[in-house]
Amino acid sequence: MHVTIKTTEEQEKMRIAGRLAADVLDMITEYVVPGVTTEELDRLCHDYIVDVQKSVPANLNYRGFPKTICTSVNHVVCHGIPNDKRLKAGDVINIDVTVIRDGFHGDTSRMYFVGKPPAHAQRLAETCFQAMWRGIETVRPGTRLGDIGHAIQTFVEQNNYSVVREYCGHGIGRIYHEDPQVLHYGEPGTGFELKSGMTFTVEPMVNAGKRHVRLLPDGWTVITKDHSLSAQWEHTVLVTEQGHEVLTLGSADRRMH
């Protein structure tokens, strides 16, 4: 495993990329309404990144992915491809965006409610949000990756939900996906020991039903096998000498956390 430790200069570039990614999710919030298509949301995000931020959308053509954002609606767990289907009141959607600025990546995702959400969908999204933060709050030098996963898994399962195991967080920097893999389940005191200067994502996917998932024939879209709702939140995190710094904070964090 090759884990990159970012220099002070590289950390500042990661901060900038992270802020830009968070700004995209703040910008798109007002457009997530009944009747809009995920294709339209994708176009708005793409144009904002390219024309306003003067940055690069990392997802577009990454390993063949055809769009700028991932839009995962209701029982879609992750990597949903924007299309021309209109969102309807009561839908829940995760929007996942990664921005490249000056060679460095900022990666974040957030849950949005289309109109007024059903109570059970709101509870799932909020539980996932709190689970992500439980994981992030363990991050400091000397913490092990298993501690992050254990904090997330314990909280999720206490709330009678399940953690998806096939997809995980990842190191990030000049390279979009680098070491280490950050699992959202695990045993405390196990796994790689965190060191100051590491940057990685924490991005739990939480299902209302069972944890099992299925990949659709498009090769990207992942759904819950039992068609239960799924939620995800994601931040890019820097390990500091004192603890951690979240590089992708946005308006939703200030509102919910």
Predicted segment positions?
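Active-site neighborhoods and metal-handling regions in enzymes and metal-associated proteins
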Residues: 1-257
